[in-house]
Swiss-Prot record:
One of its GO terms (cellular component) is cytoplasm. Residues 160-333 form the OBG-type G domain. GTP binds at residues 166-173, 191-195, 213-216, 283-286, 314-316. It comes from Serratia proteamaculans (strain 568). This is GTPase Obg.
């Protein structure tokens, strides 16, 4: 299935049903009083995280989702039926953003997590609500409010503990094949990896971590060169980044400059991502002798200004790979889980009409001193008043 990690959709909640103006009519009771019911609330729109999904491709074709409108109120104090909610399933790891305001509405990081993204309109009030000692036959009602409408952007961010960084053909996919059951494509040409992939590294029966491989970066990626930097967002949730450097490039390029290219592109993408723990890993030491590899690694680290520890591995021969994985596992175990997942926005989204009915009743009470009987006509049953919310 094609990997799609972004989709823009329109979500529209249902409108609230209108209130009803009605009067009770029974035999021998000509003036039975008001019995108009309230309308029903509009349906809400929810997102539901589903661990069985791994792409947003469905929403490249279906872009509009509308919840059901609430039914209007009826006579005999019958309240209109509430509109049905609509639930949209998205992969775990989806970030939800309001395109109009840029606000992050939520981060779907848990299976079956629900997030309301559009709230249904409030129901209108029937004329029974407006009955009082000075207005025994009210002809006022209110209309239901419109449902919330949002243009939202769905962004799928992979949930991984470890992220792989490096130029094309640095050996990232080979590394994942060596340490996990994942089988990304490997070849001797650039950009063999076109979409992100995940692999689970099992150290023993109880300990494991997830590693993410993204397409390689090249100089100018921040300006759109190569595959650009759009896939770097999949590393935002990682707790540690492994920066793979080809210690003996086949094109005889300078490994120091190659490493600096990655660091520069990382800085241009996000300050937060550039400050994540990053480990330096020299790959393909099997191409040259052990002593020469050690000398080159030391020289490259000094040229980069690298002061921390670095690793030398051969992903093809699995040389040094196991020790690296155990160090990664120990590091992950010492980090709080919260580091891997950004603090998500609150799931409750505030909407502007939360106090709608309270304000409506307050307005009516404020006008209680007005003489609503001045234009009363015993013969006029059609003079309906509708209160519009400003």
């Amino acid at each position: 299935m094609k990997f799609v990690d972004e989709a823009a959709i329109l979500v529209v909640a249902g409108d609230g049903g209108n209130g009803c103006v009605s009067f009770r009519r029974e035999k021998y009771i000509p003036n039975g009083g008001p019995d108009g019911g309230d309308g029903g609330d509009g349906g809400d729109v929810y997102l539901l995280a589903d661990e069985n999904l791994n792409t947003l491709i469905d929403y490249r074709f279906e872009k509009s989702f509308r919840a059901e409108r609430g039914q209007n109120g009826q006579s005999r104090d019958c309240t209109g039926k509430r509109g049905k909610d609509i639930t949209i399933k998205v992969p775990v790891g989806t970030r939800v953003q309001d395109q109009g305001t840029g606000e992050i509405l939520g981060d779907m990081t848990r299976h079956e997590q629900r997030l309301m993204v559009a709230k249904g309109g409030w129901h209108g009030l029937g004329n029974t609500r407006f009955k009082s000692s000075v207005n025994r036959a009210p002809r006022q009602k209110t209309l239901g409010t419109a449902g919330e409408a949002r243009d939202i952007l769905l962004e799928l961010l992979l949930l991984a503990d470890v992220g792989m960084l490096g130029l094309p053909n640095a050996g990232k996919s080979t590394f994942i094949r060596a340490v996990s059951a994942a089988k990304p494509k490997v070849a001797d040409y650039p950009f063999t990896t076109l979409v992100p992939s995940l692999g689970v590294v099992r150290m023993d029966h109880e300990q494991s971590f997830v590693v993410a491989d993204i397409p390689g970066l090249i100089e100018g990626a921040s300006d759109g060169a190569g595959l650009g930097i759009r896939f770097l967002k999949h590393l935002e949730r990682c707790r540690v980044l492994l920066h793979l450097v080809d210690i003996a490039p086949i094109d005889e390029s300078d490994p120091v400059e190659n490493a600096k290219v990655i660091i520069n592109e990382l800085n241009q993408y996000s300050e937060n991502l550039s400050q994540k723990p990053r480990w330096l890993v020299f790959n393909k030491i099997d191409v040259i002798g052990e002593e020469e590899a050690a000398e080159r690694a030391k020289a490259i680290a000094e040229g980069m200004g690298w002061e921390g520890k670095y690793y030398m591995i051969s992903a093809v021969n699995r040389e040094g790979v196991n020790a690296l994985c155990w160090d990664v596992m120990k590091f992950i175990n010492t980090q709080p889980k919260a580091m891997a997942i950004e603090e998500s926005a609150p799931e409750k989204v505030e909407f502007m009409w939360d106090d709608y009915h309270r304000e409506q009743i307050a307005e009516v009470e404020a006008e209680a001193d007005d003489d609503w009987d001045d234009d009363w006509d015993e013969e006029d049953d059609e003079g309906v008043e509708i209160i519009y919310q400003k």
